[in-house]
Amino acid sequence: MLSVDMDNKGNGPVGVKNSMENGRPPDPADWAVTDVVNYFRTAGFEEQACAFQEQEIDGKSLLLMTRNDVLTGLQLKLGPALKIYEYHVKPLQTKHLKNNSS
């Protein structure tokens, strides 16, 4: 399972490691909407996590999101949207692609 290193208080990149603590499947493609919402809440984006709930973004949808989707489609303020994409969505996509390419 994944856990998020909460020593990072600036909403920047967080360490994602295997753990049994939070109950999310290790592969983001298997996350339900609630897993995505909880991931962003745990990462310090309490307010912005609601947008993922409202737009019904599950793990598969999260992995398909473009920078433009995050910056405009979720109707978030620019600062948090940039951090969410650069420090969370993009790294999750990269890690998923790396783990699933053989």
Curated annotation (Swiss-Prot):
Species of origin: Mus musculus
CDD domains: SAM_Atherin-like (cd09583)
Any Pfam family matching the protein: SAM_1
PANTHER family referenced in this protein's UniProt entry, alphabetically: ATHERIN-RELATED, POLYCOMB GROUP PROTEIN
Record lineage: Eukaryota, Metazoa, Chordata, Craniata, Vertebrata
Gene3D superfamilies: Transcription Factor, Ets-1 (1.10.150.50)
Renumbered residue ranges of the record's region Disordered: 1-29
Residues in SAM domain copies: 31-99
Domain of life: Eukaryota
Protein name, UniProt field: Sterile alpha motif domain-containing protein 13
